[in-house]
Amino acid sequence: MELLRTITYQPAAGTKMCEQALGKACGGDSKKKRPQQPSEDGQPQAQVTPAAPHHHHHHSHSGPEISRIIVDPTTGKRYCRGKVLGKGGFAKCYEMTDLTNNKVYAAKIIPHSRVAKPHQREKIDKEIELHRLLHHKHVVQFYHYFEDKENIYILLEYCSRRSMAHILKARKVLTEPEVRYYLRQIVSGLKYLHEQEILHRDLKLGNFFINEAMELKVGDFGLAARLEPLEHRRRTICGTPNYLSPEVLNKQGHGCESDIWALGCVMYTMLLGRPPFETTNLKETYRCIREARYTMPSSLLAPAKHLIASMLSKNPEDRPSLDDIIRHDFFLQGFTPDRLSSSCCHTVPDFHLSSPAKNFFKKAAAALFGGKKDKARYNDTHNKVSKEDEDIYKLRHDLKKVSITQQPSKHRADEEPQPPPTTVARSGTSAVENKQQIGDAIRMIVRGTLGSCSSSSECLEDSTMGSVADTVARVLRGCLENMPEADCIPKEQLSTSFQWVTKWVDYSNKYGFGYQLSDHTVGVLFNNGAHMSLLPDKKTVHYYAELGQCSVFPATDAPEQFISQVTVLKYFSHYMEENLMDGGDLPSVTDIRRPRLYLLQWLKSDKALMMLFNDGTFQVNFYHDHTKIIICNQSEEYLLTYINEDRISTTFRLTTLLMSGCSLELKNRMEYALNMLLQRCN
């Protein structure tokens, strides 16, 4: 049953049903009703089914107990089955751990006995076929599937904070800022699906999953289908009753507009704690849906009312597009948090919570925006966000990574536009040809260099900085030119620690580029070419006017000429600590004996960020999938670390790659990284 419903005698209104089941519900004997069983808190029990497939009726899952240790017959990989996460019509979803690397998945396990009929197996195959091709930040990631004699196993992204249905069950209603936060992510994922010409057809709270970082992922593709032209659309009725659109009920087919209708139902439910068309029986619910008849409480503000009303327009053509939704006043005129605390899963957030960080940002906002004392208030359903808060939000928002101008080309909704294919210059290529190739490959956006003059377009660096870059480029190029072809990464992996950039902020439109190292040192390379670091003790500042010239002073007693820069350094430190996640799983090690790292040069293209440090550490972060390459020198030996899109790291000796080769995905990134390094002063 779907979650949010007052205790009524409505028969299982949240259950996914096919046309046959819906027909019986509409035309059957309405006297045969069974009361829903409330949970301990007085709310109806939710049947949350992570990635549950389409089903006709509820089935029990009695049968042979699934083994604790499961082996993929094809690869020989061993998995450990954990706790049950949810149940569907054909399947149960379990926590499942890959015993080779301890990666945790959500595994949908479907007994062959449940899909013995051809049309049942066809549904599972169709779901796998659609889902395995999808890759988006706000869509549950499909990883792998296999089968043995007893079951089919589908390995999906594990979302530790369960679903929006669980959150709403605990919270009853959400605040407007939270609804904006979640809806933005739903719209992002749904826009990607529609661009792939895929209809979800079962958007509801139980199919929005939340990961550890409070990021939302659209899941459950059991009812998903390819978008067909209007005249070729199938007329079957499928979905969850409370979220069905008028055109689907009227057997006119399911289009993108039908997903928009369901999104309107979702927004209404988040804000008010119940679906808009809920009634005491299914027949009346369908009558209300066909007439688009529902109540709009006065507690909602005008922008929220207007957006809901537009999405729940009876005529599909009158509903807004996903782009229209994001441009609506509900989003433009209201406060949206950059991130949510995990406490929001069970507690109303206090966006006015007083804290040292909040007070710090208050002062920062006052300094940057003139210290206005405007007391005008912005009212929403649950919060009053003052002008002061809007200024703080503006500061936080302004500190976000500068967005890259989108190019008019087709690409994934969460990706930056792709540059042309990279070309690594081989031996024998002339310097002129080399520069031309790299110029074609890398589309530069912005850069910063230690000791440079911000008013000059030339790259001003001394010979030492040039030699650091040349050494890294020579080593990386030598590896790429001589390593053999391979289709996987080497098995030999190292366990070592080194410093790398875990967080970064590009605020070069005002101040400069900020970053945090894995030992919690925070650095800023200012636009005027000076570099300043706040050490992990948060008490000591290192200042470099140029390479090798270091001044050291206390953060609380900075020389007068450095006070403004120390203030900005602290802004960056607070912002990254409060708002940004670490970019990988490498250990954080603080070793005071190690030489201090400071940034020599950073460079952004339309695809990646490059950072070069004084000791030759070289890091490239790729925007679209959050993968990273780090090259460093330890004990006169070069190491390369690759952090994949799941933030899992592997470290190799470059000599190992030179002998064994590597996967194409890693090689392509190494080539692009080399091109960025060679391009850095062009």
Swiss-Prot record:
Region Disordered, annotated ranges: 25-67, 403-432
GO molecular function, one term: protein serine kinase activity
Record EC number: 2.7.11.21
Induction comment from the UniProt entry of this chain: Directly regulated by p53/TP53. Induced by serum and phorbol ester.
Organs and tissues of expression: Brain, lung and heart.
Active site: 202
UniProt-annotated location(s): Cytoplasm, Cytoskeleton, Microtubule organizing center, Centrosome, Centriole; Cell projection, Dendrite
UniProt modification remark: Catalytic activity is enhanced by phosphorylation of Thr-236.
GO biological process annotation, one example: mitotic cell cycle
Biased composition (Polar residues): 36-48
Domain POLO box: 500-578, 598-682
Residue numbers bearing the Phosphothreonine modification: 236
Knockout-associated phenotype: Embryos display a delay in skeletal development and retarded growth. Embryonic fibroblasts proliferated slowly and displayed a delayed entry into S phase. Mice display loss of dendritic spines and impaired memory formation.
GO cellular component: centriole; centrosome; chromatin; cytoplasm; dendrite; nucleoplasm
Known function: Tumor suppressor serine/threonine-protein kinase involved in synaptic plasticity, centriole duplication and G1/S phase transition. Polo-like kinases act by binding and phosphorylating proteins that are already phosphorylated on a specific motif recognized by the POLO box domains. Phosphorylates CPAP, NPM1, RAPGEF2, RASGRF1, SNCA, SIPA1L1 and SYNGAP1.
Subunit structure: Interacts with NSF; causing NSF dissociation from GRIA2. Interacts with CIB1.
Family named by the database record: Belongs to the protein kinase superfamily. Ser/Thr protein kinase family. CDC5/Polo subfamily.
Name of the molecule in the record: Serine/threonine-protein kinase PLK2
